[in-house]
Design a protein with these regions (language model features):
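Juxtamembrane C-cap of transmembrane helices in multi-pass membrane transport proteins
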Residues: 12-25, 30, 37, 77-86, ...
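C-terminal transmembrane-helix exit sites in multi-pass transporters
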Residues: 45-46, 98-123, 251-271
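Helix-helix packing/entry segments at the starts of transmembrane helices
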Residues: 91-97, 168-190, 223-259
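Hydrophobic alpha-helical transmembrane segments of multi-pass integral membrane proteins
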Residues: 4-5, 29-48, 120-127, 150-157, ...
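Glycine-/small-residue-enriched transmembrane alpha-helix faces in small-molecule transporters
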Residues: 1-32, 67-70, 74, 78, ...
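Hydrophobic transmembrane alpha-helices of multi-pass small-molecule transport proteins
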Residues: 42, 114-137, 247, 256, ...
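Hydrophobic/small/kink-forming positions within alpha-helical transmembrane segments
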Residues: 14, 18, 69, 73-77, ...
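Specific transmembrane alpha-helical segments of multi-pass solute transporters/efflux pumps
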Residues: 49-90, 94, 131, 219-237
Length: 289
């Protein structure tokens, strides 16, 4: 049952690319709508049933949660922007580099030891990532995504921000439950997003009403049934298991993109993506809990 929930979370999270592609909102507005609708769904439960937990908050937890929220906002913004310039498959597979960034941070900051086999898989995954980034240069691909390299760069940036907010959140989650942590996380992210909107003077309203449905889909499927169920799954599986199953996300995203938009990545990207998934999986198994 719990394994089904884990795969369901992965599938729901993969719908993020589809809803983002369907929407014609500016990325910053799409992000604001997604966060606001998510909070409308999540905050009432947290404030009614978990409000006593807010007493556990101290200065350190507040700072870490705020920083995590900032990184989460930049992660989603980079992800949405990447989808405007590159294909769904390439963007999602490159976001999987989050696992590699986490390991690099732990190696540099926590002085984590990596086995010889782990280093081999780590280096191979970087090679595969290079071929994903450099792929898709055919005439057809260039015509559809003339700035694909920019999109892939933004996808790598999204992976970096994801790694940072994951590491910060992992510490905070030791003291706060999932509803309280995610409510605080999304609140901080929304505040940062609204500040950017105000500074850039981007209109909040006046867009096609169907964009509201896409934003609601992002909030419910990708966030509530996606990211939140991942956090729930960590109570029943080791983090290595959750990370391994999350690697199926690009597969789900690519299938949905093919069904919805007829998007098919180049042969090089497909081969490099499969190689990257297996090398990251191999690394996770070498370094698992």
């Amino acid at each position: 049952m719990y394994l089904f929930i884990l795969f369901l979370a992965c599938f729901c999270a993969s719908t993020s690319s589809i809803f983002a592609k369907l929407s014609d909102l500016p990325s910053i507005i799409l992000l604001a709508y997604r966060l606001a609708i998510t909070l409308i769904m999540l905050a009432p439960y947290t404030l009614i049933f978990q409000r006593n937990e807010f007493k556990k908050l101290n200065r350190t937890l507040v700072i870490k949660t705020a920083l995590s929220g900032v990184c989460f906002a930049f992660h989603l913004l980079s992800f949405f922007e990447a989808l405007r310039f590159a294909g769904v498959a390439e963007v999602n597979i490159l976001v999987c580099m989050e696992v590699l960034f986490i390991e690099v941070f732990e190696l540099l900051i926590l002085k984590k030891c990596i086995s010889a086999n782990g280093w081999i898989f780590l280096l191979l995954s970087c090679v595969a990532a290079y071929f994903v980034i450099s792929g898709g240069k055919s005439d057809a691909a260039s015509a559809e995504f003339p700035n694909a390299l920019l999109g892939k760069g933004l996808a790598v940036l999204a992976a970096l921000f994801s790694a940072i907010y994951t590491l910060l959140g992992r510490d905070v989650r030791k003291y706060l439950s999932m509803p309280v942590y995610t409510t605080l996380l999304y609140t901080c992210s929304l505040i940062v997003t609204l500040i950017f909107i105000a500074v850039q003077k981007v209109p909040m309203f006046g867009y096609d009403s169907r964009n509201f449905l896409y934003s609601a889909g992002l909030a419910f499927f990708a966030t509530i049934l996606g990211h939140n169920l991942f956090s729930f799954s960590l109570k029943h599986f080791k983090s290595s298991m959750v990370s391994s199953v999350k690697l199926t996300g690009p597969v789900f995203s690519s299938i949905l993109a093919w069904i919805c938009f007829g998007m098919v990545p180049s042969i090089q990207v497909m081969i490099a993506s499969v190689a990257m998934i297996f090398t990251i999986y191999g690394y996770i198994q070498c370094e698992k809990d």
